[in-house]
Amino acid sequence: MDLGIRGRRAAVAAASAGLGLACARVLATEGVRVALCGRRPDRVEAAVDALRAAGGDAVGLVADVSGAERGGAFVDRATEALGGVDILVTNAGGPPAGTFASTDVAAYPPALELNLLSTVAMCKAAVPAMIERGWGRVVAITSMTVRQPAPTLILSNTARAGTTAFLKTLATE
């Protein structure tokens, strides 16, 4: 498949395993230089090794993107490592399961920080340069629960729906 992105540069958050790594793998296969991050150095190194073994160009950064400050810092480091970021893939783990009745109000700010605010910060760090260059893409890994909420995932449903609404609004700007 040729997506027309060969030679572009991508920052892929939380990409030492799972969906993030799958995104990084596809981008690398398409000839994109990838900066990926994860919290565990051994997994970051293994992910980079796997991409390089498949012929990809990858840089690994040990980083935790589970908050606004940390998300923006990852993109800043990726920008420095790659000389810019053309494609941003926002991704992070999910907050704990729970229902409305079982979830304390105090659990909401960390969930929003993890999923919504980290995405906002990553976009704040990457999108202005994309606009200046006249080209850029933001891909957010959220959940199908933004369309149909899951009964025991109130924190995730709330944060990911907010993330989707934020990105739809950003796209119109």
Regions found by a protein language model. Name each.
Residues 41, 62-74, 105:
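The beta1-alpha1 cofactor-binding region of Rossmann-like NAD(H)/NADP(H)-dependent oxidoreductases
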Residues 99-100, 107-112:
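Substrate-binding pocket helix/loop in short-chain dehydrogenase/reductase
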Residues 139-163, 167-172:
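Catalytic loop of short-chain dehydrogenase/reductase
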